[in-house]
Amino acid sequence: MFTIALPKGALLKDSISTFKRAGLDFSDALEKNNRSLTFESNCKRAKALLVRNGDVPVYVSYGQADLGIVGYDVLRESELKVAKLLDLGFGGCHMSLAVKKNSNYLKPTDLPANCKVASKFIKTARFYFEELNIPVEIVHLTGSVELGPITGMAEAIVDLVATGKTLKENGLIKIDDLFYSTARLIGNPLSMRLDDNHLRDTILSIESTNDT
């Protein structure tokens, strides 16, 4: 039996559907009254751990899970050593730079040197501005980063944007996209090397059904 890390939240339903098409059914994890954090597939070939999206690469990297599904945004920010297996295509959103709508900033280079930029993704934000050679101070927030510009603590934010509705409701606009993030299938490197074809067969099944 091998172990899969499934992300709680927005990616969970599609993640379960992905494995179900490959013959591993963890539908019990979607039951509203179920408080369990571990689930066996109906076929008893695998078990799933229900974890926070940001913890998926941690469990996979440290070997507590052999496979996992995680957003590319989290995977890129974590920089943990995992095998990057498949782009699953769902959960799409942009990592974006946004500012107040009534500001004079139309592009990244309009931001003043050494201004503050709020983000949950501090490594991603720092790398982005270093590549542009724009000196900024990254302010790490774990909640609603939109409050950074609203309160005057920051001139801009770097955050995930799906529909743009939250930005609009808070008087913010995008001025650049860093990258497009989708759900990714990842694996533990050692598990992949020691695999007796159970992981390989699952990955191939996911790949074949994901293309249809």
Curated annotation (Swiss-Prot):
<comment type="pathway">
    <text>Amino-acid biosynthesis; L-histidine biosynthesis; L-histidine from 5-phospho-alpha-D-ribose 1-diphosphate: step 1/9.</text>
</comment>
<keyword id="KW-0368">Histidine biosynthesis</keyword>
<dbReference type="GO" id="GO:0005737">
    <property type="term" value="C:cytoplasm"/>
</dbReference>
<dbReference type="GO" id="GO:0000105">
    <property type="term" value="P:L-histidine biosynthetic process"/>
</dbReference>
<dbReference type="Pfam" id="PF01634">
    <property type="entry name" value="HisG"/>
</dbReference>
<dbReference type="InterPro" id="IPR018198">
    <property type="entry name" value="ATP_PRibTrfase_CS"/>
</dbReference>
<keyword id="KW-0328">Glycosyltransferase</keyword>
<keyword id="KW-0547">Nucleotide-binding</keyword>
<keyword id="KW-0808">Transferase</keyword>
<keyword id="KW-0067">ATP-binding</keyword>
<dbReference type="GO" id="GO:0005524">
    <property type="term" value="F:ATP binding"/>
</dbReference>
<keyword id="KW-0028">Amino-acid biosynthesis</keyword>
<comment type="function">
    <text>Catalyzes the condensation of ATP and 5-phosphoribose 1-diphosphate to form N'-(5'-phosphoribosyl)-ATP (PR-ATP). Has a crucial role in the pathway because the rate of histidine biosynthesis seems to be controlled primarily by regulation of HisG enzymatic activity.</text>
</comment>
<dbReference type="InterPro" id="IPR001348">
    <property type="entry name" value="ATP_PRibTrfase_HisG"/>
</dbReference>
<comment type="subunit">
    <text>Heteromultimer composed of HisG and HisZ subunits.</text>
</comment>
<keyword id="KW-0963">Cytoplasm</keyword>
<dbReference type="InterPro" id="IPR024893">
    <property type="entry name" value="ATP_PRibTrfase_HisG_short"/>
</dbReference>
<dbReference type="InterPro" id="IPR013820">
    <property type="entry name" value="ATP_PRibTrfase_cat"/>
</dbReference>
<dbReference type="GO" id="GO:0003879">
    <property type="term" value="F:ATP phosphoribosyltransferase activity"/>
</dbReference>
<comment type="similarity">
    <text>Belongs to the ATP phosphoribosyltransferase family. Short subfamily.</text>
</comment>
<protein>
    <recommendedName>
        <fullName>ATP phosphoribosyltransferase</fullName>
        <ecNumber>2.4.2.17</ecNumber>
    </recommendedName>
</protein>
